[in-house]
Amino acid sequence: ANSAHDRAYAWDRTKKCIDIAKAVGSKAIVLWLAREGTYIREAKDAKLAYQRLLATVDAMLDYDQDIEIWIEPKPNEPTDQAYVPTIGHALTLSYASKDHRRVKGLIESAHAMLAGLDASDEMAFALAHDKLASVHLNDQNGLKYDQDKNFGGANLRAAFNQVRVLEES
């Protein structure tokens, strides 16, 4: 956000989320960045936005020395152009962070498909870096809004390839 007030509010909420995760015994918190982006490119400084995202990831790592951060990328919706649209972007944030071992990726099949990518390839990429923390297996019929279809409901072959990649890892 461009507003310092909004960023401070978001940081307070983030700390509360980490505290709740710890209270219920969770070792991880999912960072879903689909709202981190823009509808109008000229409205935000993208370089500064990426720097702020990294600073926030580092602050989260400092706030709780044990928590893992699982970044779930999504290319659009609700924001038209997200700053972390793919697992490659998420892993770049991970490697740039102060403790990349605690920053991993969570892939939702439909989100990869919305980016025009093959979800099984995204999973294989994250697995090759030992950074696939979790998956949400679902399906998508084209580059529309996030449909959250049942896994294999639109493309059985794509579903098979995701299972194959996960089984072979």
Q: Predicted segment positions?
A:
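Active-site acidic/histidine proton-transfer and metal-coordination neighborhood
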Residues: 1-104
